[in-house]
Amino acid sequence: MSLSPALLADAGAAAAGAHGAGPGPVLAVASALALLGYAWVGLLRAPAAQGDAAVRRSVPPMALAWTAQFVALFIDISGYGLAAPGARFGFAPALSMTIWLVLTVYLIESRFLPLHSVRRVLAWLAAAAVLLAWTFPGESRPLAASPWAPLHWVLGLASYGLFGVAVLHAALMNRAEARLRQRQPGPGGLPLLQLERLTFRFVAAGVGVLSLAIFLGW
């Protein structure tokens, strides 16, 4: 029994299409879960007297969204399901990774500092970043010749995240300073001196990581 060349070509194209569409459903589910979780947190409102209770209610959806966004980023950037080995990269996944890193630092710091006032803002920013990365997943890039290329990309994204965290802290610092001048402690009582120290530390860390990324990519 022999198969015609046309039949073989059609079978090969179908197999390649099935392989290329592999990450589609998983990426869609992860992105949808992240969007739902962040939207839940963004829409969650409570009186000032119930601030801590509102934060506790937002922990499960925030954790679900944060994890789902990480899964979506891993599937998208790693190039899972691509016919050729390599990675997939673009502006939208880079922005989503940056927001995810900023949110990670916020989740850690919020356990020690009263930063609850920016929770809903970060949730909406993360939701927008997830939607952009889902809509524009980036272009496929074959594996680079240099073994340091993956580390170069990771460090570059990490530096963007650190700079994003520094910008967030600078905005919080300006807000705290304005309230201090008006003699209004404001919700959460943001510690101005701690925010100032953290801002400069994140800027210094971002410069150091970016310098290392440039050195490895030279």
Language model segments and positions:
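Short, strongly hydrophobic alpha-helical membrane anchors
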Residues: 1-26
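N-terminal signal-anchor/start-transfer transmembrane helix
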Residues: 28-50, 169
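Alpha-helical transmembrane segments
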Residues: 29-34, 150-168
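A generic, lipid-embedded transmembrane alpha helix
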Residues: 61-78, 128-133
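Hydrophobic alpha-helical segments and helix pairs
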Residues: 108-159
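A mid-sequence, solvent-exposed acidic-amphipathic segment
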Residues: 179-218
